[in-house]
């Protein structure tokens, strides 16, 4: 399967600009999203089914996973297993892969985050 950048769905979600390359209907095993943010993701959440795997392309920031803070920078990989709450802060460009593919019904809100 090939998914082209120009065909990606563009959205803004919780302060993050996202290009969604594919949906679960196109590939149930994984979904790929390119993300850019200047401040981070302003919602703490978890997903009941999918692991979230992030490759940091550019920038630096902080990831908060299960209330533990981790520093990240370009070329780092972050893996968040299913059912682990998380959010992130910082000026970042990154690729997120969810496996299995992200499904909205399994994403659960924990709290909104003030990133100021």
Go through each PLM region and give its residues:
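Compact, glycine-rich, soluble single-domain proteins
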Residues: 33-35
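A short beta-strand-loop-beta hairpin characteristic of the jelly-roll/cupin
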Residues: 47-74, 110
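Forkhead-associated
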Residues: 37-39
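A short, N-terminal "cap"/entry segment at the start of jelly-roll beta-barrel domains
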Residues: 1-31, 41-44, 109-116
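Short strand-coil-strand connectors
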Residues: 24, 64-68, 91
């Amino acid at each position: 399967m090939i998914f082209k950048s120009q065909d990606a769905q563009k959205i803004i979600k919780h302060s993050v600009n996202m290009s969604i390359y594919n949906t679960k209907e196109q590939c149930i095993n994984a979904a790929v999203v390119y993300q850019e943010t200047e401040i981070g993701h302003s919602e703490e959440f978890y997903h009941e089914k999918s692991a979230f795997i992030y490759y940091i392309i550019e920038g630096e920031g902080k990831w908060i996973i299960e209330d533990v803070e981790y520093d990240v920078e370009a070329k780092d990989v972050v893996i968040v297993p299913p059912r682990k709450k998380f959010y992130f802060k910082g000026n970042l460009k990154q690729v997120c892969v969810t496996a299995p593919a992200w499904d909205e019904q399994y994403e659960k809100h924990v709290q909104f985050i003030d990133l100021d």
